[in-house]
Amino acid sequence: MIHTERLLLRRWTDADRDAFAALNADPVVMEHMQGLLSRESSDAFVDRIETHWEAHGWGLWAVEVPGVAPFVGYVGLWPADYLADGMVEVGWRLAAAHWGNGYATEAAHEALRVGFEEVGLDEIVSFTVPQNVRSRRVMERIGLVRDPAGDFDHPRVDPVAYPHLVAHVFYRLSRDEWHRDARSISWTTFPF
C-alpha cells in the first residue's frame, strides 16, 4: 500500500470488482480498447492482476481517493512481453467521473518511482493509439518520451474488428533519465 499526496495505491479487494466491472462496461472509458468487457472478463482481469502481484510483488494497483471514492480505477506496472522479453509498461484506466483531477498522472508518477527504485527496472514504456490524446498527455507529463522508431501495430488487436486500434505510438523512459528528471516532474503542475 502506498500513499501519495491524494491517493491510496493498494492491492485489490473483492469490493473493487463491481466498480471495476462498471468502469470496463463504460463506452467512454473503453473508447480506445477492443470493446466493452463483460463482468466475467472484468473479474478474470482482476484475477490475473492478483496472480501477477503474488508472483512478482508488483503490478497494477487499485486506486482509491480517501474521503472521495473507495475505487476509481487502476494504475501501475504490467508486463508488455509481447513486444520484447522483459519489457514493462506503465498504464492506467480510471472511471470517467474521475478524469481531469490529475489522478492518473499522480499515480503513474509513483509507479515509475516504484519501477525504477524498488523493482529495479532499467526502462519503462507506455503506448496507446495515436488518437488517445489524454493518455499521451499523461505519458509526457510523467516524463516518458515518444520514440517514433518504436511505434508498432499491436499484435493483440483484431485488425478486422478494430482497424482503428491497430497502430500504436510508443513512449519510453530509462532509469537514468528518470533519476536525472524526477525532481523536475511534478503531477501538481498538470490538471490530468
PLM feature segments, named:
Residues 1-32, 62-192:
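Acyl-donor (CoA/ACP) binding surface of acyl/acetyltransferases
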